Amino acid sequence: MKKIEIPALYKKWHVDRGYELESLFEQLTEQFDIRSVLYPGCYVHITPSFYIPRAVYVDMELPAKKFFDDPSVLEYIESRKTYKEKSEVTFYHQSYEELIDEPRESFDLVISQYAGFISEPTKRYLKKGGVLMVNNSHGDAGLASIDKDFNLVAVFGQSGISEKNLDQYFIPKKKTEVTTKYLKDLGRSIGYTKTASNYIFEKVT
């Protein structure tokens, strides 16, 4: 059998740094029956494709475009996938704030990690009942927590996905009126009394 090499950029940014998030994606797909994912600001984080058959990636960076243009990346995904179907991977070399050529409400999952306020401009592509997986590195989880279109349904931490004590999250440490404008003007996360590494919101409207 042909040995499939780990793509260099993926190895550098995710394998070597221990940031593949395999456990998170495995649990997400099992618990929420996810078959399609949109990942804006992905750079070269292809781990979702190991667990989800249809993946659409969006990033402005030129190295990301070169990465996804390389046929060996899809070969690597095929070598690590955990489902029977053929992997379907699409990449858009553009800003996630611009419209992409995908139907509205066509994805089971939208991912927001380290690329700013992703949830607001991309939620149009998320199905009602679909989920947003988001961290709070740039304040996007905080933004989702006050968005009427989203409802917090789980968090992810060292013990895995949990649905316990969700009302204890997104309570500001300081007495601050948290609004969309406040978070966007700040451009980063604020301090909360209880936190998780990732938050899972269901799109309810």
Per-region residue spans from a language model:
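Class I SAM-dependent methyltransferase Rossmann-like catalytic core
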Residues: 1-35, 45-46, 178-186
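Short beta->alpha connector loops
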Residues: 20, 41-45, 113-118, 136-139
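SAM cofactor-binding core of SAM-dependent methyltransferases
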Residues: 25-82
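A short acidic, Gly/Pro-enriched loop at the edge of an enzyme's catalytic core
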Residues: 86, 93-110
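Conserved helix-to-beta-strand junction in the class I
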Residues: 124-128
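Core SAM-dependent methyltransferase catalytic element
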Residues: 168-205
